[in-house]
Amino acid sequence: MMKTSLKFLWIVCLCVTGVYAQNDLPLQVDNSTIKPLQSLFSSRLQSNLEKQLMANPQWKKLIEQKKMAVGIVDLNDPNNAKFARVNGNYMMYAASLPKIAILLSAMDAIDKGELRETAEVKKDMRLMISKSDNQASTRMIDRLGYEKIEAVMTDPKYEFYDQQHGGGLWVGKRYGGGGDTNREPLKNLSHAATVTQVCRYYYLLANGQLVNEKRSKQMLNIMENPELHHKFVNTLDKIAPTARLFRKSGSWRTYHSDSILVWGNEPNRRYILVALIDDAGGEQIIRDLVKPVERALRNTLL
């Protein structure tokens, strides 16, 4: 009887390890488990997120004024991801965060033979993401063209910009320079995002679904180890110094944004977090968001 019980326990441990202890990215999961992110909405996670956010009077006011949007994806169990959001489809100016749209468009172009993957292109992609270098970003925009970026963002495969659901990711202006523009049609924004679409981007990236697994892994390598240690990263450096961080942020005037895939050594610190803020104190708000969001995630597990 004891041997049977131990054998059963060993099998259970193996199963749990297979589900929860994946350390490699992109995730190695059955494609049939990769569902549309909106279908992974969790009412319990939503309730916990709202409770944490609305407990702060300033955040509550900003959310009600549609000047603050937050999205989270719980990846502690990759086969049972959970999604929650506040002002999820409300599109805002997002400054440099939409440079992730340039990165995906470049990978799509490279994979299709439309753009040569030279040493200069590789260097510019890394500078664009890790240091948010405007000159490198503009060079990448000029290599691709606005039409290519728009085509990838509106591609039915991704639909990262969807007019029927509030818009989404968009890059229609060079960074730090003049020239022609291609603003998005709903709000005439040049650099735009919604937290839902950015969460979708990271979710598909983590699952190896952006272009293909090879290109997704390459994008993850570019986005890992950010060289700007503010916003989400400032807090995570302190509370999770060994966690792997994949991120892109942005700031311009009162607009502050950040997006991150956190991959901790322990499964209960594996999640996607996105915030868009229109407030002069947005950078500090984003720093302060991490701990309440992690509480919401932990409370969902209980």
Regions found by a protein language model. Give the residues of each.
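Structured C-terminal helix/loop/strand segments within mature extracytoplasmic catalytic/sensor domains
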Residues: Q22-L53, Y201-L302
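Flexible glycine/proline-enriched surface loops and loop-helix/loop-strand junctions
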Residues: R85-G88, E120-V121, K131-A136, G178-L186
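A short, well-structured edge-of-sheet supersecondary motif
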Residues: N48-N87
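Mid-domain, small-residue-enriched loop/turn segments at the edges of structured enzyme/sensor domains
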Residues: M140-L210
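Short, well-structured active-site flanking segments
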Residues: D108-R126, N212-S216
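Acidic helix-start/capping segments at beta-turn-to-alpha-helix junctions
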Residues: E64-N76, E120-D133, D142-Y146, W170, ...
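Active-site SXXK
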Residues: M92-L115, M128, L273
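Bacterial Sec-dependent N-terminal signal peptides
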Residues: M1-D24
